[in-house]
Amino acid sequence: MRPLLALLLLGLVSGSPPLDDNKIPSLCPGQPGLPGTPGHHGSQGLPGRDGRDGRDGAPGAPGEKGEGGRPGLPGPRGEPGPRGEAGPMGAIGPAGECSVPPRSAFSAKRSESRVPPPADTPLPFDRVLLNEQGHYDPTTGKFTCQVPGVYYFAVHATVYRASLQFDLVKNGQSIASFFQYFGGWPKPASLSGGAMVRLEPEDQVWVQVGVGDYIGIYASIKTDSTFSGFLVYSDWHSSPVFA
């Protein structure tokens, strides 16, 4: 150990600077000297390693809403869904208007009379059985059309004391003629006839007995002679009367 310490001290003496003013350097450190002049910048060193990842920053403020994209293609048709339950019953609606078809009908009979009627003139049936619309005039025996359409007219006559021939007349023209011979029988006979005809407003229809001796229409308490008519169907929708 001692030889090693002696060698170490020898090395320190031989490597130390020359003695100044014959002073032996002290083994104790002195006061620090003045800072030296800064050295030149050295060359750039090698790049250092990447540092550790930093912590996540705070969320940024929401950006402005962008423009909508183009509509996509229609998707495939889905399966039908289950049938829904029936909804509640709705409120009752207001009553609608009910269209009533036009009407026209009458029936009348002759009063008791044993006097033969005049020929070639309208024959009055003065006792009204039905005439709700007032289209038949019992004083003249004429029916005047107010509702255009097709009508049916019928006459049922009692024949007594003479043969009878009568016509259904429209506006002065015979549309049907009927005859019953009377052979002097003790009891009355009967004669019936009818026809359908189309009428326009203000057309008139009546019964008229024939000329000569064929005027044997009769009416009494037990036997009647009647004239009736009624509308079968109407052309009211296309008539100016209802425009």
UniProtKB/Swiss-Prot annotation:
GO terms for biological process: inner ear development; protein secretion. The keyword Signal applies. Residues 30-95 form the Collagen-like domain. Residues 1-15 form the signal peptide. Homotrimer (via collagen-like domain). May form higher order oligomers by supercoiling of the trimers. May interact with ERFE. Residues 99-238 form the C1q domain. Its main location: secreted. The keyword Isomerase does not apply. It comes from the Eukaryota. It comes from Mus musculus (Mouse). One of its GO terms (cellular component) is protein-containing complex. SUPFAM superfamilies: TNF-like. Residues 15-124 are annotated as: Disordered. It is found in: Secreted. The lineage of its organism: Eukaryota, Metazoa, Chordata, Craniata, Vertebrata. This is Complement C1q tumor necrosis factor-related protein 5.
